[in-house]
Amino acid sequence: MIAAGAKSLLGLSMASPKGIFDSNSMSNSRSVVVVRACVSMDGSQTLSHNKNGSIPEVKSINGHTGQKQGPLSTVGNSTNIKWHECSVEKVDRQRLLDQKGCVIWVTGLSGSGKSTLACALNQMLYQKGKLCYILDGDNVRHGLNRDLSFKAEDRAENIRRVGEVAKLFADAGIICIASLISPYRTDRDACRSLLPEGDFVEVFMDVPLSVCEARDPKGLYKLARAGKIKGFTGIDDPYEPPLNCEISLGREGGTSPIEMAEKVVGYLDNKGYLQA
């Protein structure tokens, strides 16, 4: 840490955090990260430069530094871009957190209990010392997806964006819980394809429309039946149930949110996601 009020160039030596780069099977320690830093006039930390104006080498794991690898490519409408590699990878972040990053994709009709399950699951994993984050379908429309409507093309883009963000969370080693109606199989399958095999866990809230409509926690079914909401899933727009989801849950039998969350946690534990 840089001492408060430091004005001159400082040499910082940051040893590898325990559990990231060290293992019980390795007796000799890995190399440390050495960064040359200084404090600017506004108090912010910046990298210092060599006399020739270049940024000094940042020694990293086993002597490797962040690199720009691979040819220039075109992805969608983005041209002349290159993927930037870094020596700290997903496996290192997972060791730091002692868990494996993945996406728990909770899908189902409005009122099926998706958000309730997501919160119960988040709390249960938190109590186990596991780092999670919820991407809730309504919440993301307050910011990231506030520019999207509920037209078919915008709903597809909504799911695509959430899938990409969820992938980043998983790559960071975090257990990401995405809770969205996501009515179309093609959109959900596209999100699944973004992640390595097994890292996308689809949880289907298999609750009948009649039960969801009877609950109607937001009053949306009533508005849809009155014709005030068009294209509402389950009323005048289809919901396509998963064909091969990892977990299927239903509350018609009186199963509590805690019991459902325990089932998901049990699945994650059995698959090895709750340890690095």
From Swiss-Prot:
EC number(s) per entry: 2.7.1.25
Family annotation (InterPro entries): APS_kinase, P-loop_NTPase
Pathway: Sulfur metabolism; hydrogen sulfide biosynthesis; sulfite from sulfate: step 2/3
Biased composition (Polar residues): 62-74
Annotated region (Disordered), positions in chain: 46-74
Superkingdom per UniProt: Eukaryota
Outcome following mutation: residue 136 to A/N: Decreases affinity for substrate and catalytic efficiency
Tissue specificity remark: Expressed in root vasculature, root tips, leaf epidermal and guard cells, pollen grains and funiculus of developing seeds.
Site positions (Participates in a stacking interaction with the adenine ring of adenylyl-sulfate): 150
Active site: 182
Binding site for substrate: 138, 141, 155, 158, 181-182, 231
Impact upon substituting residue 182 to C/F: No effect on catalytic activity
Primary localization class, coarse: plastid
Swiss-Prot/TrEMBL catalytic activity: adenosine 5'-phosphosulfate + ATP = 3'-phosphoadenylyl sulfate + ADP + H(+)
Inactivation phenotype: No visible phenotype under normal growth conditions. Apk1 and apk2 double mutant exhibits a semi-dwarf phenotype.
First-tier enzyme category under EC: transferase
Any one of the GO CC terms: plastid
Transit peptide, start-end: 1-38
GO molecular function: adenylylsulfate kinase activity; ATP binding; identical protein binding
Cellular localization per UniProt: Plastid, Chloroplast
Alphabetic keyword roster: Amino-acid biosynthesis, ATP-binding, Chloroplast, Cysteine biosynthesis, Disulfide bond, Kinase, Nucleotide-binding, Plastid, Transferase, Transit peptide
Quaternary state and interactors: Homodimer; disulfide-linked. Interacts with APK2.
Function per UniProt: Catalyzes the synthesis of activated sulfate. Essential for plant reproduction and viability. Required for the production of glucosinolates.
Record protein name field: Adenylyl-sulfate kinase 1, chloroplastic
Organism: Arabidopsis thaliana
